[in-house]
């Protein structure tokens, strides 16, 4: 297995240069005009409270004009943020932690979706006839993950080691979430860590089953992602940052209580079939900005050398 830190080195080095070169400057606006904020995000349920905040007018009520740029990957979002093409972007905790330790001045300004053992949106699946019950049963097997050296690998390697297996013997195969169900069915992989809505589609085929809530090995609750900007942007736009955070927290509270209504909003942005969105487990959004929800991911990532060392979660949060 490739050393996780090596997989990040070139990209992170490029980001450092881009951040230094760009500088974050607020978009000029007339006194009575809303402040434009360019936000990068994927069309995923884990960011759907952003869509809710726009549709419900939470940003507009605070004098913000949030313009979404839908992007295909977290790496693309980070590069755009570093280069000054975005003001705010969504990022998972492992990626942001790695960037922080490389000296890239990214900081979380609002929480995103959290893993919740009572309503998991990412699960480990296996073939329907698989005998897998513990990590030992997966030793030496092929395992599908969305990205190497990231959350989708951190969950299973932690679970495998904590249930009698040896995560270092696993061959982790990077693949799109949408293709994981088919990969299980073909026998290309013996298990996979699948997020919604691909999870719902894979299970509906009847060829796969849930084998474990692998993220439970990290913690029963932890932050999956959040909203980052540069420290320079925070310094120059403190009021806008506070307003953005407040709007996102209001949207989180609304979304957690209104799954059906928020699903209708999400359908406007997602490429997933409407019936899949209706059936899948919806994301749980953090209703407070709590460093304790970030810390388990940082600690586990450091243990498995996905990042160089552990550090206090507060170091990457602008509270």
Task: Locate the predicted segments by residue.
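Short, solvent-exposed loop/beta-turn-alpha elements that line the ligand-binding surface or hinge
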Residues: 61, 115-117, 216-219, 284-293, ...
């Amino acid at each position: 297995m490739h050393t996780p830190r090596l997989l990040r080195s070139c990209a992170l080095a490029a980001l450092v240069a881009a951040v230094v070169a760009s500088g974050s400057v607020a978009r000029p606006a007339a006194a009575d005009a809303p402040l434009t904020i360019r936000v990068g995000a994927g069309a995923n349920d884990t960011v759907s409270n952003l869509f809710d905040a726009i549709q419900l007018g939470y940003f507009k009520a605070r004098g913000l004009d949030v313009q979404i740029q839908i992007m295909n990957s977290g790496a693309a979002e980070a590069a755009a943020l570093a280069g000054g093409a975005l003001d705010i972007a969504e990022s998972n905790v492992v990626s942001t932690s790695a960037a922080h330790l490389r000296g890239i001045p990214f900081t979380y300004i609002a929480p995103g979706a959290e893993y919740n053992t009572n309503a998991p949106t990412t699960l480990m699946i296996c073939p329907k006839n698989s005998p897998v019950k513990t990590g030992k049963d997966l030793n030496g097997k092929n395992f599908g993950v969305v990205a190497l050296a990231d959350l989708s690998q951190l969950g299973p390697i932690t679970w495998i080691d904590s249930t009698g297996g040896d995560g270092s013997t696993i061959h982790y195969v990077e693949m799109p979430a949408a293709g994981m169900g088919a990969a299980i069915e073909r026998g290309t992989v013996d298990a996979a860590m699948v997020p919604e809505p691909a999870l719902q589609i894979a299970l509906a085929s009847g060829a796969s089953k849930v084998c474990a809530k692998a993220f439970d090995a990290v913690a029963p609750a932890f932050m999956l992602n959040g909203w980052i900007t540069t420290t320079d942007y925070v310094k120059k736009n403190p009021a806008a940052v506070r307003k953005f955070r407040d709007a996102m927290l209001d949207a989180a509270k609304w979304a957690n209580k209104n799954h059906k209504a928020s699903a209708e909003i999400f359908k406007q942005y997602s490429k997933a079939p409407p019936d899949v969105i209706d059936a899948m487990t919806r994301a749980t959004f953090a209703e407070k900005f709590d460093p304790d929800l970030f810390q388990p991911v940082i600690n586990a990532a450091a243990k498995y050398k996905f990042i160089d060392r552990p550090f206090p979660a507060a170091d990457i949060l602008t509270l």
